[in-house]
């Protein structure tokens, strides 16, 4: 089967702006080089009015993790009588992954959203929950090598939504063109400070 991290393929990127956060992901599901489905795989989920979750990696673990975190976030809402914020979500996922470190989930999560004080938040972690929330962008998936250079070159602090959208489109399209394990369509989900979202489709190579 080869590298289990590359088995299903994925491309995921998150950018933190001045008044919005955005996640972009491809829509391909495959078994290594064999494409199984196109245009249907969701890797970006909305956990609350102020929090987005992106998951790249083995698709079975992606769906299992999402359902577990969705359940935990709903319980948090019931117990605390308020919606979970992205920093608390990141801590929750980190704890969940570390708990399963001896039989890990093969995923790379990216969490984006807004804290109660209105500040944007962006964090990511490895498969055992080591959290990194110190940068303006995060990347994950088999296309990471192709995403990294473009993000380091073009992503700046406090970018506006009008700057982020065309940049993410350019980055995800360029990366999926070079990675055989990802592509076949993509989309960008933008979350604004007022809780509104936009889901923008991106055309990519379909071969």
Curated annotation (Swiss-Prot):
Gene3D superfamilies: Glutamine Phosphoribosylpyrophosphate, subunit 1, domain 1. The gene is PRSBETA3. InterPro entries: Ntn_hydrolases_N (IPR029055), Proteasome_beta_3 (IPR033811), Proteasome_bsu_CS (IPR016050), Proteasome_sua/b (IPR001353), Proteasome_suB-type (IPR023333). The 26S proteasome consists of a 20S proteasome core and two 19S regulatory subunits. The 20S proteasome core is composed of 28 subunits that are arranged in four stacked rings, resulting in a barrel-shaped structure. The two end rings are each formed by seven alpha subunits, and the two central rings are each formed by seven beta subunits. The catalytic chamber with the active sites is on the inside of the barrel. Its main location: cytoplasm. It is found in: Cytoplasm; Nucleus. This is Proteasome subunit beta type-3. The keyword Membrane does not apply. CDD domains: proteasome_beta_type_3. SUPFAM superfamilies: N-terminal nucleophile aminohydrolases (Ntn hydrolases). It comes from the Eukaryota. PANTHER family: METALLOPROTEASE TLDD, PROTEASOME SUBUNIT BETA TYPE-3. Belongs to the peptidase T1B family. The keyword Chloroplast does not apply. One of its GO terms (biological process) is proteasome-mediated ubiquitin-dependent protein catabolic process. Keywords: Cytoplasm, Nucleus, Proteasome. It comes from Giardia intestinalis (Giardia lamblia). GO terms for cellular component: cytoplasm; nucleus; proteasome core complex, beta-subunit complex. Non-catalytic component of the proteasome, a multicatalytic proteinase complex which is characterized by its ability to cleave peptides with Arg, Phe, Tyr, Leu, and Glu adjacent to the leaving group at neutral or slightly basic pH. The proteasome has an ATP-dependent proteolytic activity.
């Amino acid at each position: 089967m080869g590298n289990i991290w590359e088995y299903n393929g994925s491309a995921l990127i998150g950018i933190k702006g001045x008044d919005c956060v955005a996640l972009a992901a491809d829509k391909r599901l495959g078994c290594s080089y064999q494409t199984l489905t196109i245009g249907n795989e969701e890797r970006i989920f909305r956990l609350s009015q102020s929090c987005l979750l992106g998951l790249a990696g083995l698709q079975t673990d992606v769906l299992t993790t999402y359902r577990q975190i969705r359940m935990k976030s709903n319980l948090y809402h019931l117990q605390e009588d308020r919606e979970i914020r992205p920093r608390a979500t990141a801590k929750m996922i980190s704890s969940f992954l570390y708990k399963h470190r001896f039989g890990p989930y093969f995923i790379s999560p990216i969490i984006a959203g807004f804290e109660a004080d209105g500040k944007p938040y962006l964090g990511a972690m490895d498969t055992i929950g080591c959290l990194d929330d110190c940068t303006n962008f995060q990347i994950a998936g088999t296309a990471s090598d192709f995403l990294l250079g473009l993000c380091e070159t073009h992503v700046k602090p406090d970018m506006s939504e009008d700057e982020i959208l065309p940049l993410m489109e350019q980055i995800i399209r360029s990366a999926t063109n070079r990675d055989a394990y990802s592509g076949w369509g993509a989309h960008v989900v933008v979350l604004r400070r007022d809780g509104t979202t936009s889901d923008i489709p991106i055309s990519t190579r379909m071969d």
